[in-house]
């Protein structure tokens, strides 16, 4: 069975040159300016171009190659900047004093003021992407190597663009190929994750480890042999790692402990660099490779062994959920939007977890002491997680509107969730109200007691304690666990769990135990509140995407629509798309509090300088536990204390940050105005809550009604 079709679509630059060629309506050209917005909205909405599932699948497949090409170009640009406009070699010689910079502002109208002195005789903008630390970890010792990698990135980008064109225009896979889920799982697990990790582990062992070992010992980067010399010359490697002299003999004689000089299991951080032991990370990636190479043989393909995904899903029938997974496999295989939703949700959870690993287990040398980069990486990965979660909800709603077939989905898990949607939404709504009032109420109580001069009646570590006992138990367990589970390890996975390990590099704290107290308990419940509100908005958008009491035939109106026609007042801003819009606002709210919590907590309890005698002087002097228990403390000791430096930056090389700071707050305040106008959204939520009141026979006589759009805008502009 040949799985590709030859030359299915002509390569035509004339066609591509015509704006809107993908849509009959748009190809006619503009009649109003709305046309240009629709171009942007529909260019990648392949569902709207055609109903042919095979063609849609090919377009998505091809677009993935295009995306990879763009990523390679972007990466190449990063490496090129490191080669052409950076002080990487100076930083490599003295990473504790020189600040990383790979951007020089050209003098056009005076913005060269932004080029500050970053050390190493270099004027530029300090960068906080962590690339320098990553380059050192991968064994790059010169700017020439960065040039070569940048060129390699462009070559790979070209290959990706070619592959995208080839697999749509020259040899396009057939639908059966796209729907062969087991083969896809096997190939991605074994190929991408398994062989990818194996290749990276190989690079780490043969190139990164010897070079970093020499760098840590203080050898001048210019005197370190080039990467290929380590790969080709076994004696050179054996100088650093003696077991290399034995070659592969210990591997085949199963005498693997011989390799423990370069595949370690130490735990904790390297005291020279403040990063994870690179011998630990090489061991880790080798283990991951083995794991995924095995996983890549789990699913049944041409060979008769292993599990078929459909059978695996059907086998999960417990007593309560009898036919629970019936037809779920078919839905995932045939509906791209459902698969995107599940994948985006899983990847988002991973991204948010990764954000925490970047500071708790800093993977690269000298990353932990570069505080600005640590803040940036945490923020960056939290934002990615947030976008992906909202994207998961968006695609789940698109799936509900476009691909959901109620006839095939009877009484399975999906159907049961949808039938319980009123109970789910009204409970979530109650949880949000409870969390919001109680967590904010604790702060307001503290502000009031503080203002009345009654500190003994406040919730804090020195008055009424609300210790996060479960979190402390988890921390303690992780601090002690390696003693029994990994007796040979030198330390637990991270100093943050507790104990007395403080890692300092060059007089700066890299990482120390992070104590949790009443202040963390309070802000944690703000996190719980904002996240639950985000979930409420997004889930409501998904569960009511096809129908609601307000608009029973919503599925016919599509994923995004302004109102249900002119005759139905109060149905505006109620589409699934509008829920994504409102969900994004709350995702931003959630992340703001998370980043505030992280940056203040780290500056107060972890980061700082350390004296010769070993006395730690934290950046904000450990004020988090007492100050952050009141709203006033957050405003005065965090927001104002940290913002005043930015606001007073005009005339220094930091001035751009002051301007961006002002501008970002203006955008934020302006956007609040639009939040209050979701008329139909609120009406739909109210109907669900009224249902819950009717169930319990406590419904009010006066019928609850959402604010009109005019009223909502009045409230919005007043707040603004």
UniProtKB/Swiss-Prot annotation:
List of residues binding phylloquinone: 682
SUPFAM superfamilies in UniProt: Photosystem I subunits PsaA/PsaB
Molecular functions per Gene Ontology: 4 iron, 4 sulfur cluster binding; chlorophyll binding; metal ion binding; oxidoreductase activity
Pfam families named among the record's database cross-references: PsaA_PsaB (PF00223)
Binding residues for [4Fe-4S] cluster: 563, 572
Residue spans crossing the bilayer: 60-83, 146-169, 185-209, 281-299, 336-359, 375-401, 423-445, 521-539, 579-600, 654-676, 714-720
Co-factor binding comment: P700 is a chlorophyll a/chlorophyll a' dimer, A0 is one or more chlorophyll a, A1 is one or both phylloquinones and FX is a shared 4Fe-4S iron-sulfur center.
Reactions that this protein is recorded to catalyse: reduced [plastocyanin] + hnu + oxidized [2Fe-2S]-[ferredoxin] = oxidized [plastocyanin] + reduced [2Fe-2S]-[ferredoxin]
Protein name stated in the entry: Photosystem I P700 chlorophyll a apoprotein A1
Origin species: Marsilea botryocarpa (Water clover)
Classification of source organism: Eukaryota, Viridiplantae, Streptophyta, Embryophyta, Tracheophyta
